[in-house]
UniProtKB/Swiss-Prot annotation:
PROSITE patterns: FIBRINOGEN_C_1, FIBRINOGEN_C_2. It holds the Pfam family Fibrinogen_C. This is Fibrinogen-like protein 1. It comes from Bos taurus (Bovine). GO terms for biological process: adaptive immune response; blood coagulation; hepatocyte proliferation; negative regulation of T cell activation; regulation of immune response. Disulfide bonds join 83-112, 248-261. Residues 74-306 form the Fibrinogen C-terminal domain. Keywords: Adaptive immunity, Coiled coil, Disulfide bond, Immunity, Secreted, Signal. It is found in: Secreted.
Length: 312
């Protein structure tokens, strides 16, 4: 009986030993497989990062080569409300991008100036007189011009300006240059454009800069009542909303926030060189060059008041 019991104990021990060994082998195999899966996942993530970097580098290379005839493709990862969001997402190359303001029904192309601290949405550009700015209400409402070349002239459109500037507080910066290779700028806090019902009226806040404050008429109290553009409705030759007995848009050949008529008109007729005019229908910024000098180039651009510039 004792021998039988002893045999059973030995047999049981052998079986248990084999089972324990099998379990240990199974656990080791599981650990090995988990390590392999983790290694594969890590490699996949590394490859995804490399692919993203290569795509971004390719975009930069295309721009550096001057291939500007297309909007920069960001891969459809997300929609951006303005150029500041694109900049903050890591895209630091100036060029045309697609944006979609919060209330906009669709995306549209715009030039993003990623210099000068970055994140600027360009709403207007004058550079060579290649575009006709003597347009009707519909053209100014919807926008027009060259949305392909980086120095192309365009107006982003009053509807788009309204959609952009009602989604937050924006700063307007105006870069000006004359034919003598001098440059100045004017900057306004809280730039806002009203809706269609209010004829896309202009609202601007505190001024700073080197070109003088031509938009509010503060340069001379006696002319402010007729020269200020503050709260003025937009006018075109076929939609006269100014305070003048005549039609400022017809006389000055452009659409603008005219009063009686202006101390600034950045959409005026492009004169290809310095001139002495009988009328003030050129690209005018009175506080820098007066009413009778037409500027060589203008860029109007906006970004949020609270944007933190890139100081590089």
């Amino acid at each position: 009986m004792a021998k039988m019991f002893s045999f059973i104990l030995v047999t049981t021990a052998l079986v248990m030993g084999r089972g324990s060994s099998a379990l240990e082998n199974c656990l080791q195999e599981q650990a090995r497989l988990r390590a392999q899966v983790y290694l594969l996942e890590t490699r996949v993530k590394q490859q995804q990062v490399k692919i993203s970097q290569l795509l971004h580098e390719k975009q930069v290379q295309l721009l550096d080569k001057g291939e500007e005839n297309s909007v920069i493709d960001l891969g459809g990862k997300r929609q951006y409300a303005d150029c500041s969001e694109i900049f903050n997402d890591g895209y630091k190359q100036s060029g045309f991008y697609k944006i979609k303001p919060l209330q906009s029904p669709a995306e549209f192309s715009v030039y993003c100036d990623m210099s000068d601290g970055g994140g600027w949405t360009v709403i207007q550009r004058r550079s060579d007189g290649s575009e006709n700015f003597n347009r009707d209400w519909s053209d100014y409402e919807n926008g027009f011009g060259n949305f392909v070349q980086k120095n192309g002239e365009y107006w982003l459109g009053n509807r788009n300006l309204h959609l952009l500037t009602t989604q937050g507080d924006y700063t307007l910066k105006i870069d000006l240059a004359d034919f003598e290779k001098n440059s100045r700028y004017a900057q306004y806090k809280n730039f806002k454009v009203g809706d269609e019902k209010n004829s896309y009226d202009l609202h601007i806040g505190e001024y700073s800069g080197t070109a003088g404050d031509s938009l509010t008429g503060n340069f001379h109290p006696e002319v402010q009542w007729w020269a200020s553009h503050q709260r003025m409705k937009f006018s075109t030759w076929d939609r006269d909303n100014d305070n003048y007995e005549g039609n400022c848009a017809k006389e000055d050949q452009s659409g603008w926030w005219f009063n009686r008529c202006h101390s600034a008109n950045l959409n005026g007729f492009y004169h290809k060189g310095p001139y002495t005019a009988k009328t003030d229908n050129g690209i005018v910024w009175h506080t820098w060059h007066g009413w009778w000098y037409s500027l060589k180039s203008v860029v109007m651009k906006i970004r949020p008041n609270d944007f933190i510039p890139n100081i590089v």
